[in-house]
């Protein structure tokens, strides 16, 4: 996990960035590894930073182990306008509050920059989303969340350069929101 609150140079409002892996085994293994206390302490420290930051929304990049996207419909990347967490491998279940107008605005921004994300009006998210949300912000429904799915398992995969360019475009959208007073 790499929490890194940053003030973007062009933004009037600070933005915050965090990155965390997940482990489905943390909820279903018989014995805790010796590193678990340290990992959970980092999660608690990050949660305190998020609470102090008071985000208006969270943008969450995620992948999927075929819990919500399957071979029959596997977009390279997709933005959710409504999302639900499924209770697999110890993950939390329930509706995730997605600010659909913000999701649509992100899609429109990405399209204006030459990207064509898929759109999901009912995105199923799995433990890779719900476990980190519970550990890092306390619950899956604590803050509005925009899910952005990127396929990392099903060939043909996007080239790394394309993924980076999408990330930069998302960053510009976040910076524009920050300039307008939205904390992401």
Model-derived segments and spans:
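A short aromatic-anchored loop/beta-hairpin motif
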Residues: 3-109, 113, 117
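Short, surface-exposed, charged loop/turn segments at secondary-structure junctions
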Residues: 73-83, 133-137, 163-167
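Active-site beta-strand/loop microenvironment that shapes enzyme catalytic pockets
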Residues: 158-184
């Amino acid at each position: 996990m790499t929490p890194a609150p940053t003030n973007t140079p062009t933004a009037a409002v600070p933005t915050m960035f965090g990155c965390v892996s997940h482990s489905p085994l943390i909820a279903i293994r018989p014995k805790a590894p010796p590193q678990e206390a340290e990992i959970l302490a980092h999660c608690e420290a990050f949660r305190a930073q998020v609470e102090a930051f008071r985000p208006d929304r969270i943008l969450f990049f995620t992948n999927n182990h075929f819990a919500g996207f399957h071979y029959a419909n596997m977009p390279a990347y997709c933005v959710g306008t409504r999302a639900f967490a499924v209770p697999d491998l110890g993950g939390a279940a329930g509706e995730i509050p997605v600010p659909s107008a913000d999701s649509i605005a992100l899609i429109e921004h990405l399209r204006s920059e030459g990207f064509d994300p898929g759109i999901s009006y009912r995105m199923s998210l799995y433990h890779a989303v719900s476990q980190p949300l519970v550990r890092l912000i306390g619950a899956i429904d604590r803050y509005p969340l925009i899910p952005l799915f990127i396929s990392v398992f099903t060939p043909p995969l996007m080239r790394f350069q394309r993924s980076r360019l999408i990330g930069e475009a998302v960053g510009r959208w976040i910076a524009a929101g920050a300039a307008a007073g939205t904390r992401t």
